[in-house]
Every structure is written in structure tokens, then in C-alpha cells.
């Protein structure tokens, strides 16, 4: 069943504010297998192990950890896990940034990418390479405000857009934050890198729990 998808199609990468300087210094987000060791992790350790083994069946291939991951929605189940203290990271959601771009911007830049119809570690996840195949995703599930049940709804909400090896900072269009305090800190960090692209910084509490 084909479904209408938003065009442009926003994509969202979440990261801790402590990682922002490193991203700006390098001028890009790096895939886990390309990353320097001093990144502040907000992920489940056991899921990271699975991502390092989960093979990507579409070109350019490799494993999930060879890609920079994005969701198709803010306020993801992963952010809820952070908010509720379910991950090894215990710093809460306030320091978490949403870095926003679009699938079309990635395509226009000629970057290798794939995307999935649900959480990428699942054995029954389907992988796609063509933007028109975004219509294969369950956009009602992706945009759902309540996703705890049934389990398949949660799986589909966590569909992923995966960019091979690195994602240029120049393609980030917005940095969404939880609070004015974090927004001001982001602006201070951006000022330290005057040659880098300056995305808009927006307080979006409705993207958080």
C-alpha cells in the first residue's frame, strides 16, 4: 500500500550538545565506525552492538554503523528512552539536540544513502534506495503521537534514513532544542565557528517529552 509522504521529507538526527563542537570542528557528522572515540553517547549499548553486526542489503552495503542515522520524525521512541532514564546515559533530554535536514537535500548533494521502513536492526526491516520509495513507508505510524502499542507501530515509527560514512554540516537546516538555556548555549558554540553554516536555532518543546 502506497502512502503520501511529505515533500521535502524532513530527517532528524539526535545528539548531545557536548558533541556539537566536535561536529563543527570536523564539518560533518560521522558514522559510528568513522567517529572519534570522545563522542558523548546517548544510545543503548546493546543496540549499538547489534547495529555493528546488522548488514545493509542495499548498496553501498556494509553495516548500520557505517551510516549516519536519522529518523523521519522528532520526539522519537529513542528520545523517550533517554527521557525515562532507560539508557546507560542518564543526563535527561534537555541537552539533546535535533539536527534537521531533508532526504531531498541528501539526494541533491549526491550522497550515498538508504532508508528503512522500520527500526533498522530488525531482521524483517526493508531497505530502499530511491526517494520515490518513501511512499512505501507507513507515514501514519511515523507521525503517530502515541506509539507504544501494538509493537509494530513502534517499529515503524523508528524507520531510519541512513547516510553512508559522513553527513556534511552544510546540509543541516535547523537545530531544535528543548529550552532557551540550551538554545543560548548552542548559539555560543556556533559563534566559535564563524565559517560554518549557521542553521536556525529553534525552541521546540513539542519535539520532546
From Swiss-Prot:
Q: Does the keyword Nucleotidyltransferase apply?
A: yes
Active site (catalytic residues): 51, 160
Q: Residues that bind NAD(+), according to the entry?
A: 13-15, 22, 30, 51
* EC code: 2.4.2.-
The enzyme's main class, written as a single word, is transferase
What InterPro entries does the entry give? DarT
Q: Which family does it belong to?
A: Belongs to the DarT ADP-ribosyltransferase family.
The task this protein performs is described as:
Toxic component of the hybrid type II/IV toxin-antitoxin (TA) system DarTG, which plays a crucial role in controlling bacterial growth and bacteriophage infection. In case of phage infection, DarT toxin ADP-ribosylates DNA, which inhibits both viral DNA and RNA synthesis and leads to abortive infection. ADP-ribosylates ssDNA on the second thymidine of the consensus sequence 5'-TNTC-3'; the protein does not auto-modify. Arg-51 is highly flexible, allowing it to assume multiple positions in the crystal structures. Its toxic effect is neutralized by cognate antitoxin DarG.
Q: What is this protein called?
A: DNA ADP-ribosyl transferase
Organism classification: Bacteria, Thermotogati, Deinococcota, Deinococci, Thermales
